[in-house]
Design a protein with these regions (language model features):
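Hydrophobic transmembrane alpha-helices that form the core helical bundles
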Residues: 58-69, 73-140, 148, 294-311, ...
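Transmembrane helix-loop boundary segments of multi-pass membrane transporters
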Residues: 35-43, 121-133, 156-165, 273-277, ...
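TM-loop-TM module centered on a large, flexible mid-protein loop between adjacent transmembrane helices
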Residues: 78-86, 244-302, 320-380
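Membrane-interface "cap" regions at the ends of multi-pass membrane proteins
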Residues: 1-46, 50, 56-64, 485-513
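Select transmembrane alpha-helical segments in multipass membrane proteins
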Residues: 8-18, 86-100, 140, 201-212, ...
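C-terminal membrane-solvent junction of multi-pass transporters and transport-like membrane proteins
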Residues: 329-334, 389-442, 464-469
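Membrane-water interface regions at transmembrane-helix termini and the short interhelical loops
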Residues: 143-168, 226-231, 399-410
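Helix-loop-helix junctions that connect adjacent transmembrane segments
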Residues: 3-7, 39, 124-125, 129-135, ...
């Protein structure tokens, strides 16, 4: 085996990176907020998982053909966008995916890692000791830096971490699925069936729609392995299969977890297991689950940061971020890459940390206001996934048009019927979901502006984010997503004094390194 090949990810390591980057944070952290958003109505709760699963699965099948497109100096989503839409599309996705999507979520997952770590120690020790949110920010920053350094030093080692964590994280999920479904009427921890509809939890379609961003967050990152295309052995052959197999597994597990959770009206895996098993076994089972949840969270953060590091490397390599071209004249590519990893994380630290600590938030019980909560962080984590599912839809539609107009330009294809069914279903549902979400958000602000948006995970500290607060976060992220690539392009022309799109000419980019 060549040294270059030995440093790359094999099929199972890459599959583990994919599954590891998807399974974990979403199902462990978002299930409770999805339950809250749907008002604990079992049908809306379960259907939200099913709709999100259908969208994600068919999108993944569509991308299993799209990922056959030839490799360039770009990786994954940016490469596919370039091949289909040209240099401007390739640049836009490269910058947005690296700086906006991965940069922000990498930092947010650090905070979630802190929360699950403290919850683990509280569970293991049997004491609910105080841990302020500012401390979660500090510990979260440590985790983010650790995962970035690990992946910067060796993506191969990161692949082994993903492989181990992926196997282990399924243990509590499998236990929860079988226990919850096989014992639907057993309630040892105050559970009940969320399918028993009362006046307090009537089915509301708009709330199902409002839950979709959290669901799509749980399913998202299924294309992260594409961002590691140049790190996967026999990538052109294996990446499509990895995406399809991985998503079938994930959608199956998530749907069963959604059903199991609704049968017991428990939004957390630990709560679900505690409701099924006898009270005298709850502590031991909860500690058992906490260990695997901890490993799972670290695995997700590790896998996402692997994609983040690789994407920033691409930005620097192509001088696609302001100042990179000038800095590379004085410093090595490695030093410049480290600089932009730091700059990206610092920017998002300011955007995330300051509002989370400084903004006044109303208390859930209506007794006043408070500071320091993860509700803003949780809300911010939902919208990148929703926005990028819109990007996925645009790529699928553009590729489908190319497939019709220039059929001979498509060298490798999956079954035609399978592709078209998947492309039509996924793109249609994504469009409907995005449009319905925007409408539901506006409606929620118009009718219940100061009601809870349902955001918050382990450290909400009794505070809530209102519907209008959630809407403002969504609008802010849309503005950043749309405007920053243009601002970056303009600054490059002034600071580095060259036309960035020259670097995306076919002669310079279409030869893989």
């Amino acid at each position: 085996m060549k040294i270059q090949s030995a440093r790359k990810l094999g099929f199972f390591a890459a599959l583990s990176m994919l599954v590891g980057s998807v399974v974990g944070i979403g199902i462990f952290f978002k299930n409770a907020s999805i339950a809250a958003t749907t008002n604990n109505n079992g049908y809306a709760w379960l259907f939200a998982w099913i709709v999100g699963g259908i969208i994600s699965l068919f999108a993944a099948i569509s991308f299993s053909e799209i990922s056959f497109l030839k490799q360039t100096k770009l990786n994954g989503l940016a490469n596919w966008s370039y091949q289909i839409g040209g240099k401007k599309s390739g640049y836009f996705v490269l910058f947005s995916y690296g700086f906006y999507y991965l940069g922000m979520l990498g930092l947010i997952l650090g905070i979630f890692s802190s929360e699950i770590t403290i919850w683990f120690f509280q569970t293991a020790s049997g004491s609910s000791f105080s841990f302020p949110f500012w401390a979660h920010i500090l510990l979260g920053a440590f985790f983010t830096i650790l995962f970035v350094i690990t992946n910067y030093v060796s993506v191969k080692f990161s692949g082994y971490v993903a492989l181990v964590s992926t196997v282990l994280k399924f243990v509590p999920l499998i236990v929860a699925v079988f226990a919850g479904i096989f014992f639907p009427t057993t309630h040892n921890a105050g559970g009940s069936s969320a399918f028993e509809v009362t006046e307090k939890n009537n089915f509301d379609f708009s709330k199902l729609v409002l839950a979709l961003p959290a669901v799509l967050f749980a399913y998202d990152s299924f294309l992260s392995v594409g961002s590691l295309h140049n790190k996967v052995q026999k990538a052109n052959k294996r990446v499509p299969l990895i995406i399809t197999v991985g998503m079938i597994l994930i959608v199956s597990v998530y749907t069963l977890i959604g059903l199991s959770s609704a049968l017991h009206n428990k939004g957390t895996i630990s709560g679900l297991i505690s409701d099924v098993f006898p009270a005298n076994a709850v502590r031991g089972i909860t500690i058992f689950v906490a260990v695997f949840l901890l490993i799972s969270t670290y695995g997700v953060a590790n896998s996402l940061n692997a994609a983040f590091v690789n994407q920033v490397r691409d930005l620097v390599k192509l001088n696609a971020i302001v100042g990179a071209h000038s800095l590379k004249k004085k410093y090595s590519n490695e030093k410049v890459t480290i600089f932009y990893l730091i700059i990206t994380l610092v920017f998002w630290a300011l955007v995330i940390y300051i509002p989370s600590l400084a903004i006044k938030l109303p208390k859930k019980d209506g007794t006043g206001i408070g500071y320091g909560s993860d509700v803003i962080v949780d809300s911010m984590s939902n919208f990148p996934s929703l926005i990028f599912f819109g990007v996925y839809m645009a790529i699928i539609v553009a590729y489908s048009r190319k497939k019709i107009k220039y059929p001979n330009s498509i060298e490798r294809k999956i079954n035609p019927k399978l592709y078209w069914i998947s492309a039509i279903i996924s793109s249609s549902l994504i469009l409907i979901a995005v449009a319905a979400f925007i409408y539901s958000q506006i409606y929620a602000v118009a009718t219940q502006a100061h009601s809870s948006s349902g955001a918050g995970v382990f450290a909400d500290n009794g505070l809530m984010l209102t519907n209008i607060g959630s809407f403002l976060i969504f609008i802010t992220q849309i503005l950043i997503f749309v405007s920053f690539p243009y601002i970056n392009y303009f600054l490059i022309s002034k600071v580095d004094k060259f036309d960035l799109f020259d670097n995306f000419d076919s002669a310079k980019i279409e030869k893989a390194e």
